[in-house]
Amino acid sequence: LEISGWSEVEPVFLMGNHEQMMLRFLAEPEREARWLRVGGLQTLMSYGVSAASERGPEALAAAREALAEALGPHLDFVEATRFAHLSGNVLCVHAAADPALGPEDQDVGVLLWGHPDFLARPRADGLWVVHGHTVVEEPTIAGGRIAVDTGAYYSGRLTAVRLAPGEAPRFLTTLGG
């Protein structure tokens, strides 16, 4: 994977629940075959791996081997992603953070899958959590949360937010498909 054009900042890449499921599938294909039903088949096809239409142990093992080979250096990239990134009073995560806990006390499962209080209870500690996972029609800022998941997988609109000291957050959204 090659990224160019970054002159001011070093990019940080976060792990999401689907990446975690893929890594678990690669480790234990029979136990983690559920991944195939939630984007795994599409991932296999995107890497040129025939979809595992059979769910038997041999088919799953073959899919696992083919995917591991097809991923090549992308596997190292995914394994090196972070669960969270903290910069000042901004915590970037895939899904959520428990509003009752500080950034250093968060559970990885919450960071990747969410927390029941995350959208219902505003943060009271001054921390802002930038997150995806929960699709919003438009990017939003509320309750110590900055939501940027505009449903790219179905809307074609991918959103990011630029946060700079002394400036208002600036959303960048593709036009979609």
Which functions belong to the PLM regions below?
Residues L1-R37:
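Core catalytic region of metal-dependent phosphoesterases/phosphodiesterases
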